[in-house]
Regions:
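Acidic-aromatic substrate-binding/catalytic surfaces of carbohydrate-active enzymes
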Residues: 1-26
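Hydrophobic side chains in beta-strands
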Residues: 14, 41, 64, 75, ...
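Acidic, contiguous internal or C-terminal segments within carbohydrate-active enzymes
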Residues: 50-91, 95
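Beta-strand-rich recognition/accessory modules
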Residues: 46-54, 134-214
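Extended, loop-rich substrate-binding clefts of extracytoplasmic carbohydrate-active enzymes
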Residues: 24-66
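Divalent metal-coordination and catalytic microenvironments
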Residues: 39, 73, 206
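A generic structural signal for short beta-strands and their flanking turns/coil linkers
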Residues: 6-12, 33-35, 45, 56-58, ...
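Active-site/ligand-binding surface loops and adjacent short beta/alpha elements
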Residues: 82-84, 92-164
């Protein structure tokens, strides 16, 4: 359904994230995840899809290796004027208990928690997944790790060209009991990577922006 919220997997947010850097775009998280892609390569371990939306060309490549899922996103401005674009992978990661989870690799980055309105910068290198976590991180390094303490494991995220990250979990101090996503908060953490908000990118006409994550 075109208006359905996607809860799981790796939804692709482009050419804007949320409602855009100026909070004036609809639908939320862009058109890419509501657009049909043409598959141009379909090998057993590599898929490439292309689409065109709002004068922005989208190319998304997914490669599966023995140790990682590698994704590369290219956004091309087909307009005659510069365009501000954002691109994020809204990755859902399964954990044993989100209340015990932490994200490592944030020291020195700035943060803005959109659930609480708080802002600051990280002195420590870890962010705990507490209630009301909807935290946009800017100036983040190329290596993050989700520490899944209850299962004794780490999920590593490595990026290229991705200055932004978002850590989100629907656990809330005012959760409504009839919200199925909120009820499932313990089972997952979203560690999203790409370029968004303060790090949205101005792409010149007939130029492109490429980023990757694994």
């Amino acid at each position: 359904e075109s208006e359905a919220v996607i809860r799981g997997g790796i939804p692709l947010c482009a050419p804007w994230f949320g409602h855009g850097p100026n909070n004036d775009q609809d639908p939320q998280h862009g058109l890419a995840r509501r657009t049909d892609f043409e598959v141009t390569v379909a090998d057993p371990f590599r898929v490439v899809g292309v689409a065109e939306t709002a004068s922005i060309g989208i190319r998304h490549e997914v490669v599966m290796t023995n140790t990682a899922l590698e994704m590369t996103l290219t956004l091309t401005n087909h307009d005659q004027k510069p365009r501000v674009v954002e691109g994020m992978w809204h990755t859902y990661l399964r954990v044993a208990d989100a209340a015990q989870a932490r994200v490592r690799g944030v020291r020195g980055a700035s943060w803005h928690n959109f659930a609480t309105g708080d802002k600051g910068s990280f002195d420590a290198n870890e962010l705990a997944v507490a209630p009301d976590t909807d935290t946009v991180i800017q100036g983040v390094g190329p290596a993050l790790a989700l520490l899944d303490s209850a299962w004794g494991r780490q999920i590593h995220v490595e990026t290229t060209g991705c200055p932004s990250a978002v850590v989100w979990n629907p656990r809330s101090s005012s959760t409504h009991a009839d919200n199925p996503t909120a009820q499932a908060w313990r089972d997952f953490v979203c560690v999203e990577t790409g370029a968004c908000k303060d790090n949205a990118v101005i792409v010149a006409p007939h130029s492109d922006l490429t980023m990757s994550t694994r």
